[in-house]
Curated annotation (Swiss-Prot):
GO molecular function, one term: ribosome binding
Gene3D superfamilies: 3.10.50.40, Trigger factor ribosome-binding domain, Trigger factor, C-terminal domain
Alphabetical keyword list: Cell cycle, Cell division, Chaperone, Cytoplasm, Isomerase, Rotamase
Entry function: Involved in protein export. Acts as a chaperone by maintaining the newly synthesized protein in an open conformation. Functions as a peptidyl-prolyl cis-trans isomerase.
Biased composition annotated in UniProt, kind: Low complexity: 440-455
Protein's name in the database: Trigger factor
One Pfam family, short name: Trigger_N
Primary residence: cytoplasm
Covalent S-S links between cysteines: none
A cellular-component GO term for this protein: cytoplasm
Region described as Disordered: spans on this chain: 430-465
Comp. bias (Basic and acidic residues): 456-465
Residue intervals of the PPIase FKBP-type domain: 164-245
Amino acid sequence: MSVKSTVEQLSPTRVRINVEVPFEELKPDFDRAYKALAKQVRIPGFRPGKAPAKLLEARLGRGAILEQVVNDVLPARYSEAVTTSEVKVIGQPDIEITKIEDGQEFAFSAEVDVRPEIALPDYADLEVTVDAFTIGDEDIEEQLNSLRQRFGTLTGVERPVQEGDFVSIDLSATVDGQEVPEASTTGLSHEVGSGQLIEGLDEALIGLSAGESKEFTSTLVAGEHAGKEAVITVTVQSVKERELPEADDEFAQLASEFDTLEELKADLRSRVERVKKVQQAGEIRDKVLEALLEKTEVPLPEKVVQAEIDAVLHDAVHGFDHDEAKLAEALEAQGSSRAEFDKDTKEAAEKSVKTQLLLDAIAEAEGTQVGQEELTERILFQAQRYGMAPEQFIQQVQQAGQLGAVFADVRRGKALAGVVGKVKVTDSEGNTVDTAEMFGEPAAEPEQADAAQAGDAEKAAADSE
């Protein structure tokens, strides 16, 4: 094919690709169009699919056929022009047909966002400080008590409700004197103090005994009356308290593979240390990313940012039957407003796009590769997170066309981990943090890698002599 294309740089993040297609190259496309139309159009005296081109033109008009050909060829010619021009496009193009002369010339232009050129900072110049962590006896006791609670037993009590009790309750609600059926339930189990149900419920329950009721006001967060203040009535059916087993060697044998309480505590200490290291690793990753974002200028493609904003808004109004007025009411009930929501959404979208572009640029510069094992590991993790079978999750991701997004996410995370190893990290007590234990050794620079490979080759040659 001899498609001619030129690129105009409209901004650091947007280009116009001008494409010219010689008309003679459209002959195969016209042939396909005639063949398809012949199967659709009934012309007396001809079997379906056998009517000649001239009759089809007479029946439909040359213009209609030309329009179909143009619509059919645009995607392929656009993709060809993108490949030839070597531009890194993002998102969908805005295409305009600029010239079409039957039998002579066909030309169009495509405006599209592109990945901007990004000047990356010297990672060795970056420094971040994270919280130091210690492991105290209170951490071990907290874990031990949590384990004891898992093996605790519930016993009915005849006294007023206290925090930590387990109650069976009935709930009903009214808005402006009208009952709200979807907010009513009976025999609901609830741990007092967990804060897992309606705001204000735990406070209302404290001090009630079985058979007693109490009214309180709260804001409904879901359903037809979301965002509205409701009068809630709670009735206590029963009260139970949790009795914990003694923390001794017998409990250690019951709750673990250890024979003594001291062995169990030592294991809990190791677990707490691992958890705190994971938390510190997360803080390191977040702060290194923030430092990169602060040090790097990243031009933002407007349409990509807008697409991110539109996606967030679509998800937000989905829970309100796509009624933006209801969304505004819910926001006001939470002490916010639609203006604040739009501002926060825009800022979050800009940061998200900037982060993706920056990490993609780092991955490109560092030659970050993603293996099949790493991709599979992420898919298994995501499937578990959503409570889905891996096969079902993969099928859903493929149907949604999101497998590339999963790959990109893994690559970005790997690229960021590579940068962390080159950044100076200290904790709040002034100690240097060994990031290699958390993120692995930093990858060698390309020049160093080449030199190492050359040295290995020389050594192998010497060994073979």
